[in-house]
C-alpha cells in the first residue's frame, strides 16, 4: 500500500488529506483545506498562499483518484465547489448527512450534496459499512465523537484500509484519541500504520481542558503499547501549536523508549513541521512561556479532575 500525505497541518495548512494507492485503486480521503489559525507563527499572506497552493495539489490528486472519502463536513475536510476535477465521475463515500450529525454539519452536508449533484458516478453513505474492491477492503467505523463525548462539533468516521495483510487506520478528527471508543477501535483492528489526529492544544484553557490533554497522552501511549502500528503519524490539530513537543513530551519520550516511530506528516517527508519552522524564524505569537506537561503534571491534573468528578477514578489506574 502506497501512502501520500497530500496536505496536513505540519505543512502549514488545516488539512488531513491523504492518498492511498492499494489493490489497483487510488483513494483520496478528506479532500479539504483551510488556512491556519492566527496563532500559527506564519504571516497571514503566507498562510493564505499555502492554502491556495495545497488546494491545487488536492485537485490534482483528486483528478486521478477513483474513490473519494469524506469523513465529516468541516471545511478542512471537504471542498464545497462544483468542481469536476475534484468530483467528476468519482465514487464518493460519505459520512451520513442525516443521522448522527449536528445541525451545522447537516446544513453543510446538504449544501455540499446539492453543489456536487450529478458530478460523482456513485454516492454512498459509509457509516459502519465495509466496501470491497478486487482484494481491497475499506471499512468505516460507526460515528465517533469529534473530540470529547457530547461535543457540539458532532461526529466523524474513522477509516480502515486493508490491502491483503497490510492494514492502515486513518482516524479523522478524534482530537487526540480522548474517548475510549476511538482507542478501542484501533487496538481491536491492530493496524500496521496509523494516521491520527492529535489533540487541539492551541485551545487549552478555552475549549480544551488540561485533563483531556492528560487523557489523550495516556490513550496514545496505550495505542503505542498495544498495537503493531509503526509508524504512527500524529498531526492535524496538534500541529497548530508550536508548544506541542513539550505538551506531548511524555508520548514522544515513550515512543523512543519502545522503539516506535512517532512522526508528523512533514517528518515522513523529511521536513521540519511548519509550526516549528515558523516559530524559529518569526518568534512566538500567542504563547511566550510554558512548561513541559510531564508525568508529574499529568498525575496532578488527573487527580484534580477525579476529585472534581470530571472524570471517573479509573483514569488514575492508567498513570
Question: Model-found features: residue ranges?
Answer:
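Active-site environment of divalent metal-dependent phosphoester hydrolases
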Residues: 13, 73-79, 99-102, 175-180, ...
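Active-site neighborhood of phospho(di)ester-bond hydrolases with catalytic His/Asp-centered motifs
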Residues: 28-32, 65-76, 93-96, 169-174, ...
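Binuclear metal-ion centers of metallo-dependent hydrolases, dominated by the metallo-beta-lactamase
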Residues: 124-128, 212-319
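Active-site metal-binding motif and surrounding structural segment of the metallo-beta-lactamase
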Residues: 43-94, 188-195, 202
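Short, flexible/disordered intra-domain loops and linkers
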Residues: 39-49, 104, 204-212
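Metal-dependent catalytic neighborhoods of phosphoester/phosphodiester hydrolases
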Residues: 79-88, 105, 110, 244-247
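Core dinuclear metal-dependent hydrolase active-site scaffold
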Residues: 1-63, 112-181, 273-276, 280-319
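P-loop/Walker A phosphate-binding loop and immediately adjacent motor/lid segment at beta-alpha junctions
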Residues: 21-29, 33-38, 79-101, 210-211, ...
Amino acid at each position: 500500500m502506497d501512502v501520500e500525505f497530500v496536505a496536513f497541518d505540519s505543512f502549514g495548512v488545516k488539512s488531513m488529506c491523504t492518498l492511498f494507492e492499494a489493490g489497483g485503486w487510488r483513494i483520496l480521503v478528506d479532500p479539504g483545506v483551510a488556512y491556519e489559525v492566527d496563532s500559527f507563527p506564519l504571516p497571514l499572506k503566507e498562510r493564505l498562499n499555502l492554502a491556495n497552493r495545497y488546494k491545487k495539489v488536492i485537485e490534482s490528486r483528486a483528478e486521478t483518484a477513483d474513490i473519494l472519502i469524506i469523513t465529516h463536513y468541516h471545511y478542512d475536510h471537504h471542498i464545497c465547489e462544483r468542481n469536476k476535477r475534484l468530483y467528476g465521475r468519482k465514487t464518493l463515500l460519505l459520512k451520513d448527512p442525516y443521522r448522527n450529525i449536528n445541525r451545522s454539519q447537516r446544513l453543510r452536508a446538504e449544501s455540499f450534496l446539492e453543489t456536487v449533484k450529478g458530478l460523482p458516478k456513485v454516492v454512498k453513505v459509509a457509516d459502519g459499512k465495509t466496501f470491497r474492491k478486487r482484494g481491497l477492503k475499506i471499512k468505516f467505523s460507526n460515528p465517533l465523537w469529534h473530540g470529547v463525548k457530547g461535543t457540539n462539533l458532532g461526529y466523524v468516521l474513522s477509516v480502515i484500509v486493508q490491502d491483503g495483510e497490510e492494514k492502515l487506520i486513518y482516524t479523522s478528527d478524534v482530537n487526540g484519541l480522548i474517548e475510549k471508543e476511538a482507542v478501542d477501535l484501533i487496538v481491536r483492528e491492530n493496524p500496521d500504520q496509523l494516521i491520527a489526529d492529535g489533540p487541539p492544544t492551541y485551545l487549552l484553557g478555552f475549549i480544551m481542558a488540561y485533563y483531556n490533554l492528560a487523557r489523550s497522552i495516556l490513550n496514545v501511549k496505550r495505542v503505542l503499547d498495544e498495537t503493531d502500528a509503526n509508524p504512527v503519524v500524529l498531526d492535524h490539530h496538534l500541529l497548530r501549536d508550536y508548544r506541542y513537543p513539550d505538551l506531548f513530551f511524555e508520548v514522544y519520550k515513550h515512543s523512543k523508549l519502545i522503539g516506535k516511530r512517532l512522526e508528523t506528516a512533514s517528518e515522513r517527508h523529511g521536513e521540519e513541521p511548519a509550526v516549528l519552522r515558523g516559530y524559529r524564524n518569526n518568534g512566538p505569537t500567542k504563547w511566550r512561556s510554558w512548561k513541559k506537561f510531564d508525568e508529574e503534571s499529568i498525575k496532578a491534573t488527573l487527580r484534580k479532575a477525579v476529585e472534581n468528578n470530571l472524570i471517573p477514578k479509573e483514569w488514575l489506574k492508567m498513570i
